[in-house]
Amino acid sequence: MAAAVPDEAVARDVQRLLVQFQDEGGQLLGSPFDVPVDITPDRLQLVCNALLAQEDPLPLAFFVHDAEIVSSLGKTLESQAVETEKVLDIIYQPQAIFRVRAVTRCTSSLEGHSEAVISVAFSPTGKYLASGSGDTTVRFWDLSTETPHFTCKGHRHWVLSISWSPDGRKLASGCKNGQILLWDPSTGKQVGRTLAGHSKWITGLSWEPLHANPECRYVASSSKDGSVRIWDTTAGRCERILTGHTQSVTCLRWGGDGLLYSASQDRTIKVWRAHDGVLCRTLQGHGHWVNTMALSTDYALRTGAFEPAEASVNPQDLQGSLQELKERALSRYNLVRGQGPERLVSGSDDFTLFLWSPAEDKKPLTRMTGHQALINQVLFSPDSRIVASASFDKSIKLWDGRTGKYLASLRGHVAAVYQIAWSADSRLLVSGSSDSTLKVWDVKAQKLAMDLPGHADEVYAVDWSPDGQRVASGGKDKCLRIWRR
């Protein structure tokens, strides 16, 4: 009879596992090696960075079967039924090398608008802040002094939508009577002629990506009239009208691979080829109006050639030739786009979200359910790994950006959540609500980081500057507030 193996030895044998590092795309890194089961993320980071042979070590997160290794590998495995006899795949994920700190206080309350603030938007480098209001004006604010800079008059009705060109040199604004105006943030003057043609109000504006068009010449608009128009801002004329939706177009995205996406109250999303306006496919599935959508590449498209990790204390305009800016924007886009084409997520009045790979398939990848009321806004994190959705059910929900799997609900608002914005490092999220507060959430911990009261009424609009320095908010109390850490 074989000698009984001492218990400690058995215990010791169990304490080691064979693991294999892989990147998110399934690419293997090195060969399998054995580790103690109580290995921590810090130790994994040292080993993984040694294998990657990077000059500067990257901050990494590690996952086993979609669960993040937070304290130790063993702790993560306890919550899962994993066969430990086999080689265990550990997925490593580079994290942002810079860190955005949560904003904690209101540093200015800027008065000037005489009606509700409907939209706020920082320029791609965070140098300028613009707002659109029910008082028919667009305003630019000086961020170094946190004072009003220019008041832009020209619209004859509420300004419903504003959008920065990705080079930060022009702002487009669309109003309730269907007109689009362009503004120069350095002078506050109107640029070129008024773009008129839509018969009803403007619901969305989206610029052609910088890597496709470094002159930032073309902008697309969507309208309650059911059409999408592409405008040549240099010539001041409409290049193309895209028709096919049978009801109001609610939002619009100009993607990085030459496609335009439009969502509508006719329950569909249409995918168009931007250069000739040909309809590629219609995405169907929602049972009610499609209110909102987002692309996995949105943040890279919005910021163009600006790299948040290299932000200076005082944001500047982008320097470099058009060709250099184009190349920088393209490499940033390709990094986020990764192996597959860009993904799209849509949110509807039917309380659901759908995740699509619209360049490839007209069937959704997955349907995301859980909200108890209509969805106001949906956004991919800048690194495209997480989707956040804000709803009239007072919650924000987090979903996996690749699979659409439900991750968590962020609860704390006591009324509808209207708008959300991500910090550039994908670690924090800010939300504005009908309950008059803003809240900053720690996404990894899935909990409230900061409660920001201050507005006297509903908060309609919120944005986080791409350099991470400031959050801006506006709403029914006509006041624009700037929040800093």
Curated annotation (Swiss-Prot):
A GO CC annotation given for this chain: nucleoplasm
Source organism phylogeny: Eukaryota, Metazoa, Chordata, Craniata, Vertebrata
Pfam families named in the record: NLE, WD40
InterPro entries reported in the protein's UniProt record: G-protein_beta_WD-40_rep, Gprotein_B, NLE, WD40/YVTN_repeat-like_dom_sf, WD40_repeat_CS, WD40_repeat_dom_sf, WD40_rpt
Gene: NLE1
Any GO BP annotation: mitotic cell cycle
Disulfide bonds: none
Name listed for the protein in its UniProt record: Notchless protein homolog 1
Family: Belongs to the NLE1/RSA4 family.
Native source species: Homo sapiens (Human)
Keyword presence, Lipid metabolism: no
